Amino acid sequence: MLLAVLYCLLWSFQTSAGHFPRACVSSKNLMEKECCPPWSGDRSPCGQLSGRGSCQNILLSNAPLGPQFPFTGVDDRESWPSVFYNRTCQCSGNFMGFNCGNCKFGFWGPNCTERRLLVRRNIFDLSAPEKDKFFAYLTLAKHTISSDYVIPIGTYGQMKNGSTPMFNDINIYDLFVWMHYYVSMDALLGGSEIWRDIDFAHEAPAFLPWHRLFLLRWEQEIQKLTGDENFTIPYWDWRDAEKCDICTDEYMGGQHPTNPNLLSPASFFSSWQIVCSRLEEYNSHQSLCNGTPEGPLRRNPGNHDKSRTPRLPSSADVEFCLSLTQYESGSMDKAANFSFRNTLEGFASPLTGIADASQSSMHNALHIYMNGTMSQVQGSANDPIFLLHHAFVDSIFEQWLRRHRPLQEVYPEANAPIGHNRESYMVPFIPLYRNGDFFISSKDLGYDYSYLQDSDPDSFQDYIKSYLEQASRIWSWLLGAAMVGAVLTALLAGLVSLLCRHKRKQLPEEKQPLLMEKEDYHSLYQSHL
């Protein structure tokens, strides 16, 4: 019944997601490299007549890149989106969208002047009707073709530089699956050659900002599709979990009774078909995923390689990540040490902060643990657990931002892997967003987390917490300095004592020093610290 109502509502709302706007994929658009569609409100490009925006040249960053991708001019995602477009809508004020027809995140109303803060909640705190509504919304998205966006099924070169467009329709849910595939796919170098060391959303600084935007766009799309402006993606708090407690038919699906790799027939998602999961097949044909169904969701949680991922992350692991003061370090990739991003992503140990190629922890641990569709990077968003998992990862990112209060300059401006510099535009989003735009508090983007609302981020304790953590990290140095100081003090005290004993015979009693009894200043200093 609920699904029937949602289908009726569908046609009342204009949808808007992310990637190639349907209005911008004609040969004329591609050859002129312009994507400035009219806004329906006044039918002018970018809503210019109403002051919403205007068609502008795209200004690309020329900051140097890291050495991980040693090619130029071979991948459509380089200097995004310049291979396809060099002019797009630049929106004014609080307007946003490929035609400036939407509001920026956190703003609402016909003129985008109303501020609102939505709250993402723990999935276990949802009532049964709220939970069922969430599943119904996802199912509706899975069965609704995007009216605004299409996906390319060939490279720009295969389209003969735009003269022969190659695009397919796709449903709204799979549109986002395709985007996650496209941003992380290998580079096709021609012939049978590929380059694997490239990813515009993982293994480098943009991992957290990119997925933050990804969830916001997904959330916004569901809001528009259903007309439910209060919709938010719930999160799964997996800290200290001993098993996949959301892998039941009541929630994200239990195991099939006869095939442990499939979902239970009683699950909401057992009939779902996945897309974009056959990376090696696409690579061998030098082709892109075209959105064709490729079989059912697969998941066998806990039956994974336990030598690589011995357990799910603990509260202590999360707290260690949050204690790291550097967002990024060194090579700014999966070999980075003491990097909050690399540790949270799961390429560095949550015990030491040292990169460890033999282990998958934190964020990566959940993907490996699911032992199925979600375990492959390119196709992982097929599994709706992806949404709940990444919502919680984003909440940890938010905790770090609130605790350390970094300036935007903390996000690397240059020398990060391709696509990850601060001013780089995020692949494959249109409208355009820069990585640094999402290195800010979630509250500035219009959302919060229920479990973070209980603490006051402006309290004195939270304000000084990061400074206390820094002090704890230099404790060994302080201890060494104190020991040296103690030795020097003892020598001085001995010298003074000798002098005093020498003078004690010469001075009246009332003028003798009032020496304290033995007192452990060092212990006192330790206890205060």
UniProtKB/Swiss-Prot annotation:
Membrane topology: Single-pass type I membrane protein
Keywords: Albinism, Copper, Deafness, Disease variant, Glycoprotein, Melanin biosynthesis, Membrane, Metal-binding, Monooxygenase, Oxidoreductase, Signal, Transmembrane, Transmembrane helix, Tumor antigen, Waardenburg syndrome
Gene Ontology CC terms, in alphabetical order: cytoplasm; Golgi-associated vesicle; intracellular membrane-bounded organelle; lysosome; melanosome; melanosome membrane; perinuclear region of cytoplasm
Subcellular compartments: Melanosome membrane; Melanosome
Region: Disordered, residue numbers: 287-313
Chain's role: This is a copper-containing oxidase that functions in the formation of pigments such as melanins and other polyphenolic compounds. Catalyzes the initial and rate limiting step in the cascade of reactions leading to melanin production from tyrosine. In addition to hydroxylating tyrosine to DOPA (3,4-dihydroxyphenylalanine), also catalyzes the oxidation of DOPA to DOPA-quinone, and possibly the oxidation of DHI (5,6-dihydroxyindole) to indole-5,6 quinone.
E.C. number: 1.14.18.1
A Pfam family per the record: Tyrosinase
Post-translational modification (record): Glycosylated.
Cytoplasmic side: 498-529
Annotated catalysed reactions: 2 L-dopa + O2 = 2 L-dopaquinone + 2 H2O; L-tyrosine + O2 = L-dopaquinone + H2O; 2 5,6-dihydroxyindole-2-carboxylate + O2 = 2 indole-5,6-quinone-2-carboxylate + 2 H2O
Protein name: Tyrosinase
Residue ranges, Lumenal, melanosome side: 19-476
